[in-house]
Amino acid sequence: MITELHGIDIRENEPLKHYTYTKVGGPADFLAFPRNHYELSRIVAYANKENMPWLVLGNASNLIVRDGGIRGFVIMFDKLNAVHLNGYTLEAEAGANLIETTKIAKFHSLTGFEFACGIPGSIGGAVFMNAGAYGGEISHIFLSAKVLTPSGEIKTISARDMAFGYRHSAIQETGDIVISAKFALKPGNYDTISQEMNRLNHLRQLKQPLEFPSCGSVFKRPPGHFAGQLIMEANLKGHRIGGVEVSEKHTGFMINVADGTAKDYEDLIAYVIETVENHSGVRLEPEVRIIGENL
């Protein structure tokens, strides 16, 4: 127990596989769940003072944590999950569940968030990755974000400063961590919004292996191609390493079917990249983030 951080939910040597969508990941030295910005600031200030590394995991959806785990502090925003509406502006804390946030927008007949109705993860992770699907993405509705800098300062970043691109935002380079974000929505019709969300969720259920642990879409879309199509053409559908395999339902996904490890994921990703490049000449670029230490 760290005396200076008394009162904060901190768990020592906690296996991260219990918190990731892939169901893999070694232990965090310290896993912290701040309830508010004050507790978050205390954790970061302590870590910086002690020269301990720290990072935020978000909801750990489009992410693989290596089997050796993560040193220092891992911070999860599960308890920082409030969502507020001010007119047509929706503000959500970083730990707010993305899918649940789209439901709140729908309940208030606000349109703009429908594209994200089936994307797993948190608001903070969605901003970080500029998450998107079915022609929509976070940058289309983003107004601003309150972020925590690596030094512990809290500041506001505009949409322009975010420099959004395909599955990219400026904070991927700066190390700033989203605390909350504001989105500009528009008045809509509840039934129309609901029908569109039902349609998109039906498509997702038909095409994606939602019944298995996975890290979501593994690769970015290569220009002029679809990653899943290239993988299928290279005869990799169902290819398995250890407990992880290329999904037969959607070859752009890798699923944990038998107590797979992070090494299984990494080995399969590397094998798919090499095989697809040899077959088509196209080198796939991972969309999923891989962090932590090997065993």
UniProtKB/Swiss-Prot annotation:
It is found in: Cytoplasm. Pfam families: FAD_binding_4, MurB_C. Its EC number is 1.3.1.98. InterPro entries: FAD-bd_PCMH, FAD-bd_PCMH-like_sf, FAD-bd_PCMH_sub1, FAD-bd_PCMH_sub2, MurB, MurB_C, MurB_C_sf, Oxid_FAD_bind_N. Its main location: cytoplasm. GO terms for biological process: cell division; cell wall organization; peptidoglycan biosynthetic process; regulation of cell shape. Its cofactor is FAD. Keywords: Cell cycle, Cell division, Cell shape, Cell wall biogenesis/degradation, Cytoplasm, FAD, Flavoprotein, NADP, Oxidoreductase, Peptidoglycan synthesis. GO terms for cellular component: cytosol. It catalyses: UDP-N-acetyl-alpha-D-muramate + NADP(+) = UDP-N-acetyl-3-O-(1-carboxyvinyl)-alpha-D-glucosamine + NADPH + H(+). SUPFAM superfamilies: FAD-binding/transporter-associated domain-like, Uridine diphospho-N-Acetylenolpyruvylglucosamine reductase, MurB, C-terminal domain. The keyword Transport does not apply. It is an enzyme of class 1 (oxidoreductase). Residues 23-188 form the FAD-binding PCMH-type domain. The active site is at residues 167, 217, 287. Gene3D superfamilies: 3.30.465.10, UDP-N-acetylenolpyruvoylglucosamine reductase, C-terminal domain, Uridine Diphospho-n-acetylenolpyruvylglucosamine Reductase, domain 2. Pathway: Cell wall biogenesis; peptidoglycan biosynthesis. GO terms for molecular function: FAD binding; UDP-N-acetylmuramate dehydrogenase activity. The keyword Glycoprotein does not apply. HAMAP family: MurB. Cell wall formation. Belongs to the MurB family. This is UDP-N-acetylenolpyruvoylglucosamine reductase. It comes from Streptococcus pyogenes serotype M1.
